[in-house]
């Protein structure tokens, strides 16, 4: 790669942390001055990753036990790593967060110790069930607030009160109301609440694929995506914008976060777009649009596809194959718009001397494609389970990275990848746990069906109008939320309306998933657009 482009990458990276911290709560973690605390947290995170590798290879404990362990360690790490508010010190660990971390572990400890009795009680909670259940719910809400902001916890609290005071509502949303102990029981000691399907997928598929992404990142795959996109499209008309589309699509499919994707690739691509003449607003818009689209691009699709497959009871390959055409059309539309804008404004590509050659990029890091090809084979053609595919893809990635010196990972790098994976999984896992409160209440009260009936009533049983109202509902429900909770909420609340009108469940779920993601681009929240504007200087 040319020296000039490399310098631009380094300059863009200087603002990386500042932009991430402004728009992504996940990046506001503590950096301790006390080395002993740092080592302790690293040990917990690495142990967490090793636990998931072990269970994926040799089998997990009983469902409730496995999910409770997953949630407890997630909560523990969040309270140790993330301060109670943005202005709090990030170099010291306050005593109250240590206590919260220990209490978090006790919520799983209780289930592990009393598991047989919990099963034998058959859904009739005792006092300890209620106490630990309430504690867990409060901890999940607070951890979700620290990681994702206020939107998801507030929505979860509203649903909790809806379960308690359903009699106070009128019309189709009225229900008989449920006692406190019944609601807590639904959320804690069953697999329909906090320990429901969402956290189950987080504790199995999602964690492993995030860990896979972390190992790829340590091997230099992110830089490879940027370089190969630059080599392929950098010299074409309006090239840097097309580079943004390709790089963001590649990376977004794996990392699952639109904001992180914007910042990771945008700090490199947006300055390049500005240099060839694209305006600030257009540069930011291209990066935001491309980054959001990565979550509908196979093979990983930001991990949401795995939840869809689990909820619908269909093979993952069915979801990924069905997503190829709409994802292709999405990116074709973006690239076409870029090309037309470049032609209109007379924007040329970069000079050949400023960009790397495809052959040079492939020679240096082309072998990193092999783990992705292996993953595609395992998911689509081998007939093996997703967990099996994810585990062995991680192993293959480590082995392939050792082939060349430029990507070789020492033991320190491997441990760093395990820690990176565990940390990166926190935001997804806690979002899934918080969404479990919403889904648990919706299941208990029948809220999803009630909302579906309301949408159909407003649409007058017209499929077109129902699609329009469902689209609006998905965009509203997805505002300010990560992609995975967005899909879970929209599939629970909005998809049933489409199914009642005769649309196949899979088609309905894909519809709500796509439009839920577009909340990242839709005012007034538009978090991906805000992050891109922070880099481009647009408005």
Question: Can you describe what each PLM-predicted range is?
Answer:
Residues 2-39, 45, 321-424, 529-539:
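Long, contiguous bundles of hydrophobic transmembrane helices that form the permeation core
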Residues 41-46, 66-79, 96-105, 130-139, ...:
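Hydrophobic mid-bilayer segments of alpha-helices in multi-pass membrane transport proteins
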Residues 142, 146-147, 157-172, 180-223, ...:
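Core transmembrane alpha-helical segments of multi-pass membrane transporters/permeases
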Residues 85-89, 109-123, 147, 167-180:
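Transmembrane alpha-helix boundary signature
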Residues 127-131, 192-205, 231-245, 276-282, ...:
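Membrane-interfacial loop-to-helix junctions in multi-pass transporters
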Residues 1-120, 130-134:
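Conserved, well-structured core domains of diverse proteins
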Residues 226-294, 300, 304, 313, ...:
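Hydrophobic transmembrane alpha-helices that form the pore/transport pathway of multi-pass ion
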Residues 362-510, 514-522, 537-539:
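Long hydrophobic segments that form regular secondary structure
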């Amino acid at each position: 790669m040319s020296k000039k482009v490399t310098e631009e990458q380094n300059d863009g990276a200087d603002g990386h942390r500042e932009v991430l911290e402004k728009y992504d709560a996940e990046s506001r973690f503590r950096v301790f001055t006390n080395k002993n605390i740092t080592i302790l947290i690293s040990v917990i995170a690495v142990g967490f990753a090793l636990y998931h590798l072990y269970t994926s290879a040799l089998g997990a404990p009983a469902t409730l036990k496995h999910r409770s362990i997953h949630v407890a360690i997630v909560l523990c790490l969040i309270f140790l790593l993330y301060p109670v508010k943005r202005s709090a010190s990030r170099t010291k660990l306050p005593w109250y967060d240590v206590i919260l971390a220990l209490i978090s572990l006790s919520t799983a400890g209780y289930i592990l110790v009393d598991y047989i009795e919990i099963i034998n009680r058959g859904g009739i909670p005792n006092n300890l069930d209620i106490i630990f259940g309430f504690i867990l719910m409060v901890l999940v809400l607070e951890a979700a607030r620290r990681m994702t902001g206020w939107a998801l916890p507030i929505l979860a609290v509203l649903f909790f009160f809806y379960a308690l005071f359903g009699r106070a509502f009128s019309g189709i949303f009225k229900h008989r109301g449920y006692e406190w102990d019944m609601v807590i029981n639904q959320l804690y000691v069953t697999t329909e609440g906090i320990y429901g399907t969402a956290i189950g997928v987080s504790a199995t598929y999602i964690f492993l694929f995030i860990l896979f992404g972390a190992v790829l990142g340590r091997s230099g795959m992110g830089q490879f995506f940027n370089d190969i996109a630059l080599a392929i499209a950098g010299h074409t008309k309006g090239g840097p914008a097309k580079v943004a589309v390709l790089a963001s699509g590649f990376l977004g499919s794996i990392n699952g976060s639109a904001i992180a994707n914007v910042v990771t690739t945008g700090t490199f691509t947006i300055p390049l777009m500005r240099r060839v003449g694209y305006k600030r607003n257009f540069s930011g818009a291209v990066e935001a649009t491309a980054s959001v689209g990565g979550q509908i691009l196979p093979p990983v699709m930001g991990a949401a596809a795995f939840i869809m497959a689990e909820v619908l009871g269909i093979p993952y390959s069915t979801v990924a194959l069905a997503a190829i055409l709409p994802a292709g059309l999405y990116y074709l539309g973006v690239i076409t718009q870029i090309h037309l804008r470049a032609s209109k404004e007379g924007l040329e590509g970069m000079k050949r001397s400023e960009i790397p050659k495809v052959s040079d990029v492939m020679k240096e890091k082309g072998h990193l494609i092999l783990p992705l090809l292996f993953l595609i084979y395992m998911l689509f053609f081998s007939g093996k389970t997703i967990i099996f595919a994810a585990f062995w893809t991680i192993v293959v990635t480590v082995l392939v990275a050792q082939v060349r010196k430029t990507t070789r990972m020492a033991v320190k790098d491997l441990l760093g990848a395990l820690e990176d994976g565990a940390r990166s999984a926190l935001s997804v896992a806690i979002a899934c746990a918080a969404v479990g409160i919403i889904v648990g209440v919706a299941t208990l009260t029948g809220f999803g069906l009630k909302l579906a009936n309301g949408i159909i009533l407003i649409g007058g049983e017209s499929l077109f109008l129902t699609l329009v109202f469902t689209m609006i509902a998905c965009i509203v429900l997805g505002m300010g939320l990560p992609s995975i909770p967005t899909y879970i909420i929209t599939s629970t609340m909005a998809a049933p309306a489409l199914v009642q009108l005769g649309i196949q469940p899979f088609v309905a779920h894909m519809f709500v998933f796509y439009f839920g993601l577009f909340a990242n681009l839709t005012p007034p929240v538009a978090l991906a657009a805000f992050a891109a504007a922070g880099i481009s200087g647009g408005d």
